Each structure stands twice: as structure tokens, then as C-alpha cells.
Amino acid sequence: IDSETSRVIETEAEYIVNNPPLNILEYSCEYFGSSYEGRKEGTKKLLGITHKSPIVVEESRKIIFFPTTSAENEKCVWINLEKIDKYYKLDPKRTAIVFKNGDLIELDISYGSLTNQILRASRLKFLLDQRILKKENKI
């Protein structure tokens, strides 16, 4: 797949989209009433993360994606945190992810880097959950 095309893997389907991954993520943020830049800024304020930031695409359904490299890198893969079942090291620079639907992908990312990205996205989810609980208890 080239820099202008993406392979999208969903729970029940897989297809090719004639758009780069970042454009798809930007569209998804806009679809749910925000912007990619706004979501990125929100992550920065909550976590202090400025590079390879996880993004909340939609907060009520807890749709959080994280990148495997810089978002501008044409080899960047965006992963939905909630869809991961497990992951394991293939070699020092490659890791496999098994999704909850049984699909498996092999990525050019070290096990440590992927773990760090998952932890960042999980921390973002935790902070959002805490804010929602805090707000619900005040009402």
C-alpha cells in the first residue's frame, strides 16, 4: 500500500481506502464533532504528550487510537486501543498484535515501543474515565 492508500481493518471487514491514515483519522474526529488538532491538543493538556500522541476520536464510546510512529510518517499505523487482545515480540524490531476478533497484524515496531504506546493510550482512557465518574458524582 502506498502513502495515499490505507488498509482499514474492522471487526467484521477489511478494505482499502484511497486516503492516507492521518486523513481518515482527521475525518473521524470531525465526524464526531471535533478536529484532529483539537484532540491532539486535548491529549497534550491531559498527559503532556506532544509526540506520537494517542487520540480520543469519540469519548462516550471510548474510541481511542494510537500511532505506531509519528503521525506524519507514511508507514504509521493507527491502532484502536479497545480492539487489542494481546501482543507479542517477533524480533527486536517487530511485534505482532492479535485483535479481539482473532485478526493478527505484524508491525515494524519494537515490543517496548508498542507497550509504551499502549500505556499512553490506556492512561488517556483512565483519565477520561475518572473525569466522567467525577462529573457523574457531582450531578
Kindly give the residue locations of the regions a language model identified.
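Eukaryotic intrinsically disordered, low-complexity regulatory linkers and tails enriched in Ser/Thr/Pro
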Residues: 1-79, 85-139
